[in-house]
């Protein structure tokens, strides 16, 4: 039976591949603002779940009364962080219907990212993002959310578990996802995810299958416990190959006003350019309990990342119009462009950890080796090496006051002087977090050489302080959460437009001053007329200091949802019907340079304010969910769209449909 179902799923996938693409993952692992933030999710220990009786053949999924005994409540998962903290915080599958229609990456993360107007394109956070990596990095990050947004978790599935998701977006925008997990025995589980992402062009699409984004992600994971529970092993391997056919934005010809971006005959700048990122990551976590309050643990991470920009000059009609600078050095191939960087790391972390009453502690030593390669960069001319070894010491501590209140802290010190300090408090009425980090610059802003860019810099480490706190008050049908976020940056590294004629268009810059951003925020949820909800989120940002004009943040930023939520058809279907509204004030948004895969500060274009309104219908029946969504109602009414990134128009009005199914056999 299992084999037949997997074959059926494979046939469906193969038959639909022309429209398939991949976007966000299921609600189980998303971290947007939830519909009912005052509601606490149930915590379940797999040891408390009744074990099924052994059967002569196959798995027993029904009892003698044909009642299902396996389902979302018996298929449990746990994160590695909870395993590390010795928490038996197993969670049932989350089949929550709230916001199921938010399937694109930008909307999944509550519009806190900008992209290039299509699913799978380069992403950049609207608000300053604090990296948690102290040591050297590649400097490439615009495709990180497609890989990092869902780390593998580990299951106790009782019965085989299969999840299948498909979204058909208009004009070849779609999502597909398959996950399978099963227990080999009560102590050993394995599973996999597969997420192809195939998205058609939204500008001058020649027909179905004329792709802009081609991406394939998969992961394999397994967890094992010894019979006496002293030894634990968790393993996962992840891989992605993410390719985007870059169009360079819209080339204005007949109509050079803003309306020209929405012309049906609008042409792209680039025809043959492509960005690519490949990433492989092997992760192993294991621990052994010597005594009740004392454990030894080890982590191993092996990663490889390849970033490339490719182009064929003879295939471009606007090559020199778009790329105002081309490197004339004879060793650089500017006709068949293949620029970029390779980066490899191996990390070994060993330490001790344990529990004493309500206290958790850990201390560790970590060694990290790294190497990078750019075929056009001569390492002998640099003031630093392209490979090296980093040594860290650190520790974590957590106070679990009760099941709802916890205080955690983390300190990590790189022996060359860089560091990270972090503390977080979670209570039923207050969430607060603080972080201070001094981090090495990435390799890309330090040294790069390619067809359209070349530089060598001696940048220092970047200092960041971040504080945030949010109150949580529930008063009858009203939930309110006022709070604020304060960020301080010093020696901040960013990319900036270069207006000097004959020189490269974008250059990395290290600010000589500092930046300070203060962002008070208000989140609310109000229920009225029994089944109606309104959920606003409003953020005001004041740049208290912005040396070198390095930060570009809209002054006002808002998300609002108005929804009707109820059981329909005599209680056979749960429904959520309503409108999503996103709005932000006009500001000089960051531009994008595909040759180096970086967003940069520019002053020549203002992204106007625009109310982005979606209508959605989410439904749930038994073990399946579905949605209908009409995106960007305002453009259908006014005929005017929006520009989320200078030169790149946002998604026009369009209809999307999606569904998922979960099987237990």
Regions inferred by a protein language model and the residue ranges of each:
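Low-complexity, highly charged intrinsically disordered N-terminal segments
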Residues: 94-149, 156
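Flexible loop and strand-edge segments within Gram-negative outer membrane beta-barrel domains
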Residues: 205, 221, 228-284, 305-317, ...
């Amino acid at each position: 039976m299992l084999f037949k179902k997997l074959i059926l799923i494979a046939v469906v996938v193969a038959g639909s591949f022309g429209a398939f693409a991949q976007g966000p993952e299921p609600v189980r692992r998303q971290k947007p603002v939830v519909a009912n933030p005052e509601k606490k999710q149930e915590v379940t220990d797999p040891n408390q779940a009744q074990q099924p009786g052994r059967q002569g053949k196959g798995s027993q999924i029904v009892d003698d009364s044909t009642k299902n005994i396996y389902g979302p409540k018996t298929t449990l998962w746990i994160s590695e962080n909870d395993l590390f903290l010795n928490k038996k915080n197993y969670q049932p599958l989350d089949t929550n219907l709230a916001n199921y229609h938010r399937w694109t990456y930008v909307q999944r993360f509550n519009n806190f990212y900008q992209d290039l107007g299509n699913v799978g394109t380069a992403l950049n956070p609207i608000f300053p993002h604090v990296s948690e990596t102290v040591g050297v990095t590649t400097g490439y990050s615009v495709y990180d959310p497609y890989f990092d947004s869902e780390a593998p978790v580990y299951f106790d599935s009782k019965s085989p578990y299969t999840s299948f998701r498909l979204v058909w977006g208009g004009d070849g925008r779609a999502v597909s996802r398959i996950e399978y997990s099963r227990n080999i025995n009560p102590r050993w589980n394995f599973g996999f995810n597969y997420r192809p992402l195939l998205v058609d062009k939204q500008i001058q699409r020649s027909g179905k299958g004329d792709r802009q984004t081609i991406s394939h992600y998969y992961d394999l994971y397994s967890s094992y416990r010894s019979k006496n529970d002293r030894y634990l092993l968790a393993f996962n391997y992840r891989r992605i190959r993410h390719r985007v056919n870059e169009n360079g934005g819209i080339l204005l010809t007949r109509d050079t006003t803003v309306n020209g971006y929405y012309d049906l005959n609008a042409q792209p700048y680039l025809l043959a350019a492509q960005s690519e990122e490949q990433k492989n990551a092997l992760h192993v976590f294991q621990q052994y309990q010597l005594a009740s309050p004392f454990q030894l643990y080890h982590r191993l991470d092996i990663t490889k990342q390849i970033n490339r920009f490719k182009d064929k000059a003879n295939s471009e009609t606007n090559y020199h119009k778009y790329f105002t600078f081309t490197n004339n050095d004879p060793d650089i191939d500017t006709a068949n462009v293949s620029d970029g960087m390779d980066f490899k790391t191996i990390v070994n972390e060993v330490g001790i950890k344990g529990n004493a009453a309500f206290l958790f502690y850990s201390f560790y030593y970590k060694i990290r080796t790294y190497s990078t390669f750019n075929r056009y960069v001569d390492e002998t001319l640099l003031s630093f090496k392209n490979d090296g070894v980093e040594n860290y010491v650190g520790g974590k501590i957590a106070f679990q006051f009760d099941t709802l209140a916890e205080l955690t802290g983390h300190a990590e010190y790189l022996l060359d002087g860089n560091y990270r300090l972090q503390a977080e408090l979670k209570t039923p009425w207050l969430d607060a977090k603080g972080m201070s980090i001094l981090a090495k610059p990435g390799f890309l802003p330090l040294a790069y050489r390619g067809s359209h860019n070349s530089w060598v810099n001696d940048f220092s480490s970047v200092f960041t302080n971040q504080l945030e706190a949010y109150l949580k008050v529930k008063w009858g049908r009203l939930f309110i959460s006022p709070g604020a976020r304060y960020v301080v940056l010093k020696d901040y590294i960013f990319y900036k437009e270069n207006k000097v004629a004959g020189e490269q268009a974008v250059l990395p810059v290290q600010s000589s001053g500092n930046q300070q951003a203060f962002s008070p925020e208000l989140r609310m949820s109000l229920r009225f007329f029994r089944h109606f909800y309104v959920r606003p989120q409003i953020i005001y940002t004041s740049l208290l200091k912005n040396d070198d004009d390095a930060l570009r943040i809209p002054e006002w930023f808002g998300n609002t949802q108005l929804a009707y939520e109820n059981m329909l058809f005599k209680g056979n279907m749960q429904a959520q019907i309503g409108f999503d509204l996103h709005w932000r004030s006009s500001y000089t948004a960051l531009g994008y340079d595909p040759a180096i895969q970086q967003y940069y500060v520019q002053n020549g274009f203002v992204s106007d304010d625009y109310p982005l309104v979606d209508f959605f219908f989410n439904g749930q029946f038994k073990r399946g969910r579905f949605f209908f969504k009409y995106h960007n109602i305002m453009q259908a009414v006014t005929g005017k769209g929006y520009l989320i990134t200078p030169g790149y128009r946002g998604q026009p009005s369009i209809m999307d449909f999606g569904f998922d199914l979960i099987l237990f056999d």
